[in-house]
UniProtKB/Swiss-Prot annotation:
Pfam families: Radical_SAM (PF04055), TRAM (PF01938), UPF0004 (PF00919). This is tRNA-2-methylthio-N(6)-dimethylallyladenosine synthase. Disulfide bonds: none annotated. Residues 143-375 form the Radical SAM core domain. Residues 378-441 form the TRAM domain. It comes from Erwinia tasmaniensis (strain DSM 17950 / CFBP 7177 / CIP 109463 / NCPPB 4357 / Et1/99). It catalyses: N(6)-dimethylallyladenosine(37) in tRNA + (sulfur carrier)-SH + AH2 + 2 S-adenosyl-L-methionine = 2-methylsulfanyl-N(6)-dimethylallyladenosine(37) in tRNA + (sulfur carrier)-H + 5'-deoxyadenosine + L-methionine + A + S-adenosyl-L-homocysteine + 2 H(+). The gene is miaB.
Length: 474
């Protein structure tokens, strides 16, 4: 009988990536297959996020429902991972004794051993340590799921912004060796992946070791990934303005595979608030980065993050944020009302902005961002956009759906043979959350690179030692 695994994921793209790796790992070691139904699973895993308010309450509410499932199936194993697990540790079991495993973002690779231990001893396991880069060394080979894929290049953050829990839950910055990343990307490309999204809490701080003992910068890594045949689009998430240097901007100038869309969080447009947040840059310095980016890539679109109602934020501070939004002309962006995260420096500041004021400011900001986002979408009307076709449309299975460089969903009529490939589409309609277009040409009519397949690169460089363990020679 097939063993089933159910994973519930909350939070950022890094959590989504981690969950996919958990599924791959447990499939390779224990033969678990994923199920959408928690009641059908032998193992339930909750991958948590602690960024938002009441994160802990949300966790224990779900665990309360899972407890009932375990009462009817005592052999079921329940595990809690992610950032809430890293923060709370063994305290999770004090409130929810049904939990068998508590693991952090840096120990998910130990899940097979943890499950074996629970099965063998019926005793709970708690491991929220920070064994640095070890988790990447013990992951199975990547499995593509469509033409796009996430690839983690680093973990943690050293910036210690006063509102953020990441350094405390994921640890400080640790970069993967560049050759490991390139090999993973080549493996994904060999499986049909055309677009990769490089992941990290602060990707532009990447400093990975090379095969000869040197250090690879983020700008160098971007160019190396772009050189892999089959990879025609590169995105990255997320970056910090303080380390967005000229070398990275130069990549936008000379590497067309890097998309003309950038998510660069600013959080506030008021220097006083940026100082309280310990962001280490001013609004003027942020605008200088954008100015250089536009000089290198005039058609680039910028999205960002904003925190509303940070302790001490005045109406004048908020107006500075609104001014910055207008000056930059941000595209799709994310905004949140400030809520204190336990253990962060900002949690000790007086939360002196009323809830009504926070909500009013959030409404004003989101309304302005929505206006700008709509304007950006309308500019696409009548233009020809290159789309990476991801599959059939969610709303109409007779249509195909894909994304532009600027991350807009485009639906159009076309045959299934285009799935996983690029097409050129003329935009004919603009909607609130998507675009519609007419197919003009398929990939066979484009001049995309076909010099050497990723599979041939892997085969040519793959070596095995006397134990039969495969290695890759750069």
């Amino acid at each position: 009988m097939t063993k089933k695994l159910h994973i519930k994921t909350w939070g950022c793209q890094m959590n989504e990536y981690d969950s996919s790796k958990m599924a791959d790992l447990l499939n390779s070691t224990h033969g678990y297959t994923l199920t959408e139904q928690a009641e059908d699973a032998d193992v339930l895993l909750l991958n948590t996020c602690s960024i938002r308010e009441k994160a802990q309450e949300k966790v224990f509410a779900l665990l309360g429902r899972w407890k009932k499932l375990k009462e009817s199936n005592p052999d079921m194993i329940i595990g809690v991972g992610g950032c809430v697990a890293s923060q709370e540790g063994a305290q999770i079991r004090q409130r929810a004794s049904c939990v068998d495993i508590v693991f952090g973002p840096q120990t998910l690779h130990r899940l097979p051993e943890m499950i074996n231990s629970v099965r063998g001893t019926r005793s709970p396991v708690v491991d929220v340590s920070f064994p640095e880069i070890e988790k990447f060394d013990r992951m199975p080979e990547p499995r593509a799921d469509g033409p796009t894929a996430f690839v983690s290049i680093m973990e943690g953050c050293n910036k210690y912004c006063t509102f953020c829990v990441v350094p405390y839950t994921r640890g400080e910055e640790v970069s993967r060796p560049s050759d490991d990343i390139l090999f993973e990307v080549a493996q994904l490309a060999a499986q049909g992946v055309r677009e990769v999204n490089l992941l990290g809490q602060n990707v532009n701080a990447y400093r990975g070791e090379t095969f000869d003992g040197g250090i690879c910068s983020f700008a160098e890594l971007l160019r190396l990934v772009a050189a892999i045949d089959g990879i025609d689009r590169i995105r990255f998430t997320t970056s910090h303005p303080i380390e967005f240097n000229d070398d990275i901007i130069d990549v936008y100038r000379d590497t067309p595979e890097l998309v003309s869309f950038l998510h660069l969080p600013v959080q506030s447009g008021a220097d006083r608030i940026l100082t309280l947040m310990k962001r280490a840059h001013t609004a003027l310095e942020y605008k200088a980065i954008i100015r250089k980016l536009l000089a290198a890539r005039p058609n680039i679109q910028i999205s960002s993050d904003f925190i509303i109602g940070f302790p001490g934020e005045t109406q004048a501070d908020f107006e500075q944020t609104m001014k910055l939004i207008g000056e930059i002309n941000f595209d799709i962006s994310y905004s949140f009302i400030y809520s204190a995260r336990p253990g962060t420096p900002a949690a000790d500041l007086p939360d002196d902005v009323s809830e009504d004021e926070k909500k009013q400011r959030l409404y004003i900001l989101q309304d302005r961002i929505n206006q700008q986002t709509t304007a950006w979408s309308r500019r696409k009307l009548g233009t020809v956009q290159r789309i990476l076709v991801e599959g059939t449309s969610r709303k109409n299975v007779m249509e195909l759906s894909g994304r532009t460089e600027c991350n807009r969903v485009v639906n159009f009529e076309g045959s299934p043979e285009h799935i996983g490939k690029f097409v050129d589409v003329e935009i004919t309609d603009v909607y609130a959350n998507s675009l519609r277009g007419m197919l003009l040409r398929g990939e066979h009519q484009m001049a995309l690179r076909t010099l050497e397949t990723p599979a041939s690169v892997i085969e040519r460089t793959r070596k095995e030692n006397e134990l039969g363990v495969a290695t890759w020679l750069p």
